[in-house]
């Protein structure tokens, strides 16, 4: 019980930090886009817009990293309050990102036409994949929240011991992706690491299918299906990171 309380407090602190960060980002956005709209210098407009796109993607990766960890720990600890609050937070984040993306699309009209055409494709691929990370969080959270709300069986210990190391590796990949956005990493090595991770998650899914086949207790069926969806969305998030990394690398080269 004490451990659950500590987890809830830590998640609440993280949530408040994210709220304060978003408030600061909104003020910064207004200033940046005001300059993009008013400047006649197309190179300046592109520099501002490119920096904003990279910053926006970085911010969302940071959000996804924290939210995924909060989700998993909230689910493992059957923390209904945390999952409910996180569900609202993810919904709001999705709308916040859509608003910033619409501004960025408008900003593309202010840069040189050739640059806009070159950047447009990679911009849309990058932002679409960033959106998919947020959607993955929502898809995996909703059934887990319903599961806890209905007081079904908790996640078995063997599943917890399996998913936690996989979750840690995913957040590590997200951090490396953030480094790719802000500075630079070896793209080829990063993509290979993601591919290796996807194989690891696929192996976990295969083991879990065998686990379900051998399970004698029918009361565990629902939690096993939920766990399979967690593994599937974890795999999907890694795959999305791979596509996002390629698009970000192309954008940074322009």
Placement of each model-derived feature along the sequence:
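Cytosolic, long alpha-helical scaffolding segments
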Residues: 1-254
């Amino acid at each position: 019980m004490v451990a659950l309380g500590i987890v809830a407090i830590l998640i609440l602190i993280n949530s408040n930090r994210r709220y304060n960060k978003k408030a600061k980002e909104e003020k910064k956005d207004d200033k940046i886009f005001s300059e993009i709209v008013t400047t006649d210098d197309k190179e300046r407009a592109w520099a501002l817009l490119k920096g904003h796109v990279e910053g926006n993607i970085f911010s969302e990766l940071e959000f996804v990293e924290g939210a995924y960890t909060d989700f998993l720990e909230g689910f493992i600890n059957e923390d209904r309050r945390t999952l409910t609050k996180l569900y609202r937070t993810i919904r709001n984040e999705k709308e916040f990102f859509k608003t910033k993306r619409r501004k960025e699309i408008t900003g593309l009209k202010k840069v040189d036409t050739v640059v806009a055409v070159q950047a447009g494709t990679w911009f849309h691929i990058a932002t679409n994949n960033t959106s998919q990370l947020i959607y993955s969080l929502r898809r995996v959270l909703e059934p887990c929240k319903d599961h806890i709300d209905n007081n079904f069986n908790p996640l078995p210990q063997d599943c917890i011991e399996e998913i936690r190391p996989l979750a840690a590796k995913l957040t590590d990949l997200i951090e490396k992706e953030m480094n790719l956005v802000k500075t630079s990493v070896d793209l080829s090595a990063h993509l290979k690491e993601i591919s290796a991770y996807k194989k690891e998650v696929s192996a976990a899914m295969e083991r879990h299918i065998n686990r379900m086949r051998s399970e004698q207790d029918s009361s565990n069926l629902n939690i096993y299906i939920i766990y399979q969806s967690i593994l599937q969305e974890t795999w999907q998030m890694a795959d999305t990171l791979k596509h996002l990394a390629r698009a970000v690398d192309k954008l940074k080269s322009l």
